[in-house]
Amino acid sequence: MMAKKRVATDNAADAKMELANRLFFRLYQCANMLHKTGTRAVEAEGLTTQQWAVLGALSRPTVANGMSVGDLARYLMVSRQNLTGLIGRMERDGHVAVVPDERDRRSRLVTMTKSGRHVWEVLAQPKIRAYYGEVLGDFSINDVTHTLHYLLKILDNMKRLDDGAAGETAATDLE
C-alpha cells in the first residue's frame, strides 16, 4: 500500500514538473512575442517595449517628480547597467531627462520630458490600448484578473528566490 502511494506521489510530482516546464516555456515565448509584437505596435513613435516600460513607469502620478535610476531599475526589475544604456538613448531622443536629485546630489533622477509625455499620452497610449485589445480581446475580465493573480504569485516567488540569492552572495562576499 505504501509503495502505491509513493508511486502516485512520484507520478503527481512528475506531472507537475512537466506542467511547470510547459508553463515556463510559454512564459518565455510570451516574453519574446511581447518584445516582438509590442515593439511593432509602438515603433512608429520610435519606441521599443523597454522604452514603453520606462515611460509607463515614469507616467505614474506617484513619481511625477521623477525616479532615481536605482528605484527605476528595481521597479522594472532590470540591472542598472542595462537601464543606463536605455536611459541614455531615451535622453538622446528627448523622451526623458536625467537631473541631479536635489535631496541627494549623488543620486540622479529620471523624469519624463514634455516631449516624452506627448509621445506617451498622445501617440503611444492609443496604440498600446489597441495592442492590449488585440491580445486580450477574447479574455473576460475574470480571465484577466485570474491571469494577473497567478502571474503575481509567480513573480513574488521569483523575487523571493532573487532576494535569497542576493543574501547568499552577500554572505559569500563577507567570508
UniProtKB/Swiss-Prot annotation:
List, in alphabetical order, the GO biological process terms annotated in this UniProt record: response to stress
Which GO molecular function terms does the record list?
DNA binding; DNA-binding transcription factor activity
- Alphabetical UniProt keywords: Activator, DNA-binding, Transcription, Transcription regulation
What domain of life does the native source organism fall in? Bacteria
Tell me the SUPFAM superfamilies matching this sequence.
Answer: Winged helix' DNA-binding domain
Query: Does the record's keyword annotation contain DNA-binding?
Result: yes
Domain HTH marR-type, which positions? 20-156
Q: Which InterPro entries match?
A: HTH_MarR-typ, MarR/SlyA-like, Tscrpt_reg_MarR-type_CS, WH-like_DNA-bd_sf, WH_DNA-bd_sf
Outline what the protein does. Transcriptional activator of genes for the anaerobic degradation of benzoate.
This one is known as Transcriptional activatory protein BadR
